[in-house]
Design a protein with these regions (language model features):
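Redox-cofactor binding/interface segments in oxidoreductases and associated redox assembly factors
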Residues: 76-77, 105
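Short beta-alpha junction loops
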Residues: 107-112
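Short, aromatic/basic amphipathic alpha-helical patches
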Residues: 116-125
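N-terminal beta1-alpha1-beta2 submodule of the flavodoxin-like/Rossmannoid cofactor-binding fold
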Residues: 1-76, 83-85, 90, 94, ...
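Glycine-rich phosphate/pyrophosphate-binding loop and the adjoining helix
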Residues: 130-162
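Short, conserved loop/helix-junction motifs that constitute active-site signature segments
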Residues: 68, 94-101, 124-127
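Short, charged, surface-exposed secondary-structure boundary motifs
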Residues: 38-42, 115, 141-144
C-alpha cells in the first residue's frame, strides 16, 4: 500500500501530527500551500477568513510536489477554522478525483471541532473516496503552544490502525 499525507498547517499543530504519522507509517508528506499567503497575525487572519469561510471560497493552491494518482491511501490533515476545515483543504478535497483511493481525514482543533470532520468526509466521498478512520485531535487553547489534549497513546493507536 502506498500512502501520502497531505496537510495544511497554519500554526504547526497539523504539521506536527502529519510528521508523526509519516514517522510511524513511512507515508510520504506533502504540505499544501496557497498561492496567496495568509497573514501571520492571528487576529487579522480571523477577520480575513470569516467571510471566505461563510462563502466557502476556495483559495488557489500551489502545485503539490507529489502526484496523488501514485498513491492508494491519502491521509488529509486540516486545522479547524470557525468550526470547519481550512479553505486550502476544502480546495484540495473538492478539486481532486479520489476514485479507488482510501482517504483518511484528521483535523486539529483547540476544543471546537463541530462539523469539520464531517465536511472533510463529505467532500472526499463526493469525489469518489472511500473514507475511513477519521479522527479529531485536540490541542490546548493556547494558539502558540504545542500541548496536546488528545493523548499520545490515542494518536499512536489511531495511526497504527491506518
Amino acid at each position: 500500500m502506498s500512502g501520502l499525507i497531505v496537510y495544511y498547517s497554519y500554526k504547526n499543530h497539523t504539521r506536527l501530527i502529519a510528521e508523526k504519522i509519516s514517522e510511524i507509517t513511512g507515508f510520504d508528506l506533502c504540505e499544501i500551500e496557497t498561492v496567496d499567503d495568509y497573514t501571520d497575525d492571528y487576529d487579522m487572519l480571523v477577520d480575513e477568513t470569516v467571510d471566505n469561510l461563510k462563502s466557502q471560497t476556495k483559495p488557489e493552491l500551489q502545485l503539490l510536489d507529489k502526484e496523488i494518482s501514485n498513491y492508494d491511501t491519502i491521509v488529509v490533515g486540516s486545522p479547524v477554522w470557525w468550526y470547519t476545515i481550512a479553505p486550502p483543504i476544502r480546495t484540495f478535497l473538492s478539486s481532486n478525483d479520489f476514485t479507488g483511493k482510501t482517504v483518511i481525514p484528521f483535523v486539529t482543533h483547540a476544543g471546537w471541532p463541530r462539523s469539520a470532520i464531517k465536511e472533510a468526509n463529505k467532500l472526499a466521498e463526493a469525489n469518489g473516496a472511500d473514507v475511513k478512520n477519521p479522527i479529531e485531535i485536540q490541542f490546548t487553547t493556547d494558539h502558540d503552544a504545542d500541548d496536546l489534549v488528545t493523548s499520545d497513546d490515542d494518536i499512536k493507536s489511531w495511526i497504527g490502525s491506518l
